[in-house]
Amino acid sequence: MSYYMSPIVQKITGADPGTFVLFYVPECPYCQRALSTLRERNLPFKGYNINNISGNMPRLLQVLTTYSNLTGFNPYHTTKPIIFINGKFIGGMDDLAKYLDVQFTQ
């Protein structure tokens, strides 16, 4: 049986393995830092500007909360950026830095 899945969630769950999915806004310094970090490390990512999502941040948070059982999204995370890898929620910029430290120091 098939069911409807939001295009937002499809971007997360359908990304290639090892590809980060980042929801950001251009004017956010934490978003810019996350994008720069991924670029500097030559890590694959797909970036999606939250301003281009119909309903912007409130809609994004609503969808991510609705489908949190699939992605592990924490509904208490309400800041930008919002980052996933391998279909699972990482967090924001600080969480990305911790994730990369663990991944690259083992």
Curated annotation (Swiss-Prot):
InterPro entries xrefs: GLR_AS (IPR011767), Glutaredoxin (IPR002109), Thioredoxin-like_sf (IPR036249)
GO cellular component, one term: virion component
Record bears the keyword Electron transport: yes
Any Pfam family hit: Glutaredoxin
Entry annotated with the keyword Electron transport: yes
Main location: virion
Gene3D superfamilies in the cross-refs: Glutaredoxin
Keywords, in A-Z order: Disulfide bond, Electron transport, Redox-active center, Transport, Virion
Subcellular location: Virion
Entry-linked SUPFAM superfamilies: Thioredoxin-like
Disulfide bonds: C28-C31
Positions of the Glutaredoxin domain: 8-106
Record family assignment: Belongs to the glutaredoxin family.
Name of this protein: Probable glutaredoxin
Species of provenance: Acanthamoeba polyphaga mimivirus
